[in-house]
Structure formats: C-alpha cells, structure tokens
Amino acid sequence: MSLVYMNIIMAFTTSLVGLLMYRSHLMSSLLCLEGMMLSLFIMATLIILNAHFTLASMMPIILLVFAACEAALGLSLLVMVSNTYGTDYVQSLNLLQC
C-alpha cells in the first residue's frame, strides 16, 4: 500500500477517533465530520484517477455535494442551538424535541 493511501487512511481514522472522543461540543463534532469527508473525497479521487474509471468520475463531485449539504445543515443547527441555549453542547440537542 502506498504511503499516500496510508496517510489518507490515517487522517480518516484520526477524524473518526476525534469524533468519538470529543463529542461534547457540536463544533468539534462538525470539524471531525468534515475531516472524514475530506479524506474520503481525496481517497475516492485518487482511486478513480489511478484505476482510470471513466464511469465513476462523477462520484467525487457527488461526495462533495453531500459534504456541503452536511456542513450547511450542521452549521445551521449549531447556530440555532447556540442562539437558543447559549452553548454548543451536544446534550442541548436532546432538548430540541426533534
């Protein structure tokens, strides 16, 4: 396995561990999710470029669209929770009665 792939897998794993460990604040959870999506995007792009998959060339773009939608929803939820309760704790999400 190439050193580039190992670094990307390590970045994904580090973001996943960060998401599992620092889940008390919503902002840190969102940053870890963005790190995971970025490493998935880079990995998908490298695999498609190295394997010359012409039919799957749209997959990284679709992944970026989903990452942008996830970021927009997460930031809007962060703004709503911080304006309503004054904190960005994930425990405040249980009070929203969604």
UniProtKB/Swiss-Prot annotation:
It is an enzyme of class 7 (translocase). InterPro entries: NADH_UbQ_OxRdtase_chain4L/K, NUOK/Mnh_C1-like. Signal peptide: none annotated. Keywords: Electron transport, Membrane, Mitochondrion, Mitochondrion inner membrane, NAD, Respiratory chain, Translocase, Transmembrane, Transmembrane helix, Transport, Ubiquinone. One of its GO terms (cellular component) is respiratory chain complex I. Its EC number is 7.1.1.2. It comes from the Eukaryota. Its main location: mitochondrion. GO terms for biological process: ATP synthesis coupled electron transport. It is a multi-pass membrane protein. Core subunit of the mitochondrial membrane respiratory chain NADH dehydrogenase (Complex I) which catalyzes electron transfer from NADH through the respiratory chain, using ubiquinone as an electron acceptor. Part of the enzyme membrane arm which is embedded in the lipid bilayer and involved in proton translocation. Belongs to the complex I subunit 4L family. This is NADH-ubiquinone oxidoreductase chain 4L. It comes from Hippopotamus amphibius. The gene is MT-ND4L.
